[in-house]
Amino acid sequence: MDRDDVPYLDATLPTAQRVTDLLARMTLAEKVGQMMQLDSREDLDDHVLRKHVGSILHTSPERVLRAHDLTTRTRLQVPLLIAEDCIHGHSFHDGATIFPTQLGMAATWDPQLVEQVARVTAVEASATGVHWTFSPVLCIARDLRWGRVDETFGEDPVLIGELAAAMVRGYQGDGLTDDTAILATAKHFAGYSETQGGRDASEADLSRRKLRSWFLPPFERVAKEGCATFMLGYQTTDGVPITVNSWLLDEVLRGEWGYQGTLITDWDNVGRMVWEQKLQPDYAHAAAAAVKAGNDMIMTTPQFFEGALQAVEEGLLDEKDLDQAVTRILTLKFDLGLFENPRRPDTARQQSMINHDDHVALNLQVARRSLVLLRNDGVLPLAKGKIAVVGPLADDPQTQLGDWAGSSGQADWLPNGQPRDMITTILDGLRELSPDVTYARGADILTLEPDPEGETFPDGQPRPRIIQPCEPDAQLIAEAVAAADAADYVVAVVGDRIELVGEGRSTATLDLIGGQIALLDALAETGKPMIVVLLASKPLVLPESARDAAALVWVANPGMQGGRAIAELLHGLIEPSGRLPISFAAHAGQQPTYYNQIRGQHGSRYADLTQEPAFAFGEGLSYTTVEYGDLHVETAVLRPDETVRASITLTNTGTRPVRETVQVYV
């Protein structure tokens, strides 16, 4: 192809002119293909050469290169958008930097730090040929039984909006022409987390007032920040799938907010309208509905290709209906400069930038700042002495990383997870700092059994296996008690595992499962000072033996450097500064327990239990005391869209340094 004679290949022309020229050259099938994003683990030749796909996801390094090579064989050689779930680091690239989960980041309450995390993630991901990440998550986490709480920034829309905006800035860098920039995705628009009984992807029973008051403001914040793409949730609201919700997509997002970015469905949303929600009779009608609703990129619905072609043939769609979506997709590709440089994997950049020393240092800093001290009777920082480290999660590298990382199950090209020598577990960290450490597992947590309904869902996706909690093991408990009896301090590491976290893995209970409660009870009876480290993806309900422990630290999947950070905290080498971005329930039956609930007519309690959380949003201790004084509100009169400004004097009244997060509730 002679580039001089083809306007869309002329980089000196305005993007709009290039898009118009290319769109005029495309066949109907090529337009439909541009609207599709398919799984690269399937038939790449079919995806690229027959379906003309605009994007692929779940790409191993080998598949990325092959996909680019296939693109050079297509008629128009339109470059692909390469997408991946880089949720808290470049999650599925061997040796990449894996940070704390989004909920862990939220415990820092620090937008600048979160922006740095996203910037590092973009630098590492872009070096491997990834153009697009499906992050950040802006869902409000209220029901702790929901399996995806760990992916959120917690329960407060203001905190969520500020941290998400910071993440968008980090991902998209200095603009899309920056080779280290990747497209950010605000998800899951909107109300996805407002589940039925905490069950993932269930009907969201939300009024428009509730959406506008709580669930939409974070999305509006990142829309105005320039977030390039929005992902639509799986769920229905008022019986209407978000995928075709004209009020949300047209009136609010495109209309009121003036959003000009690209909309992508979540996994097989269009297909779900046919086979799951049963709101469309076939794929032709589903494709027509999705296009007319304003969807631009259809994720992993292979049947959309034939369905859209059939819809045009039957008059359900006009070919021009596709043009607006294809225009937005092509505009992204031109803005990224992919026609001049498709941004293939860059081996030299990978070697110099992935897991760079600066990235490791940032990872440790974020892990340190994410730790939340919830109880301390004075035992921390630890004095010299022998430490018994017990618990099934004390030496568990995958639980350190959390979901959407390593061997969490989404990437078949990384079956053994991230390199073990890159991960410092809690046991590793304590052994590095303490000369006298013993270890006993103390309990098992769970085993897995096949789902009796079959190995896959109707769309072919694998069903998670069923959890079977392990019974307390008398021998393991006896070994742990013996270790505790011989030590000066007990560090008990308990929590949840990856099998209890994520899509389709919501839990009916919030209790510690398996033999963990029996282990804690037995350790408490030894009388030795017990420090409970709750290594948990989300807040759990703790037994009395944990609530009454000498100290309690919550750690939300702290990433590769988490074990080192925890050991430093326990030994007093760093100061605890994390604050809860989400409340802890005292009982699963209290759900939800978010801090800013509206009081009911008959108060805020049950007949048998109060609604008070075990620990509330914003809580977190330090190793010193801080006195607040001289509060002065500088804004005497507040008009719409103005900002309240105030000042306060903080005094460190203790003997150790402190980082204090000043919280203002209006």
What residue ranges belong to the model's regions?
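Glycoside hydrolase catalytic-domain context in secreted enzymes
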Residues: M1-V666
